[in-house]
Design a protein with these regions (language model features):
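Glycine-rich flexible loops
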Residues: 2-273
């Protein structure tokens, strides 16, 4: 069945989005909602200053499938992204939606690897942020020197640089190194987060990027860093797990995500088309 490449949808406020009256054949209500959430993540990434022209990517699994995901068309800026512009593809590399654009090859390698192997990773985000890349180049990686870092470190894993991610055999090593983590520092390259929802994925990237920014800024000052005692490090790591686990007040980033959607509705409302 052929799928048209565009959708007409009237934008609605956050939390009240409905399936548009005219919709692309073959797109379910659940997929359309996923498209809106993912397009929002792209717009917010641009708004945060985390985009790298056309060089990075965010994806989410198509609801109800194990082998299909949505990702950006290679050629659109993040600030231009809309729900209908996103490309649906499968983990075998086939485009399942009509688009004049292709998928970034490195994006396919990275995102297909995680969507194939981590069924609880519905959303995946990869960035080349200023501070994330800076920490990724440092041998010691993310240090336990701030509260933000300590509430994230339980989720952080590392993957060694292998060149531009065009080789599909790197997928196995990416998956191995991510393990059960939620944040991956790609050494000499960038950062990656996964989440059960787009909101959780985005909230994790926010925490990781802030922790990296604080570390680089503190080191730039040249003064000796204040070492946190080991027992306080352990205590704060436990607190971070409790706060961001299911049932914790920061679980899933749901409150942050709802607030960010309201901000996006005010400042860049075209994403839900």
């Amino acid at each position: 069945m052929k799928r048209r490449a565009s959708i007409t949808a009237k934008h609605r406020p956050a939390g009240k989005r409905k399936r548009p009256a005219r919709t692309t054949r073959g797109i379910s209500t659940a997929e359309w909602q996923a498209r809106i959430e993912l397009a929002a993540a792209y717009r917010l990434t641009a708004m945060m200053g985390w985009s790298d022209m056309l060089g990075t990517h965010i994806s989410c699994r198509v609801p109800g499938t194990d082998d299909q995901f949505l990702i950006n068309p290679y050629g659109l800026l993040f600030e231009e992204m809309t729900a209908s512009a996103l490309i649906k593809c499968d983990t075998g590399g086939r485009k399942l939606s009509v688009s004049p654009y292709e998928v970034n090859e490195a994006g396919f390698t990275i995102h297909s690897a995680i969507h194939m192997s981590r069924h609880n990773a519905a959303a995946v985000m990869h960035c080349h942020t200023q501070y994330g890349v800076a920490v990724a180049t440092q041998k010691q990686g993310l240090l336990p020197v701030t509260q933000m870092a300590l509430t994230a470190l339980n989720l952080v894993r590392y993957h060694d640089f292998e060149g531009v991610a065009h080789d599909h055999d790197e997928r196995e090593r990416l998956v191995r190194d991510l393990g059960n983590g939620g944040m991956l520092i790609l050494r000499n390259h960038g950062t990656l987060t996964v989440g059960a929802t787009v909101g959780e994925m985005f909230a994790r990237m926010y925490r990781l990027e802030r922790a990296c920014k604080f570390q680089i800024t503190a080191m730039t000052g040249g003064a000796e860093l204040n070492r946190i005692p080991d027992e306080i490090v352990r205590h704060t790591l436990t607190q971070g797990q409790e706060i961001y686990s299911q049932g914790g007040r920061g679980a899933g980033g749901s409150l942050m995500w709802a607030a960010l959607l309201r901000k996006l509705d005010r400042e860049s409302p075209g994403y839900a088309r």
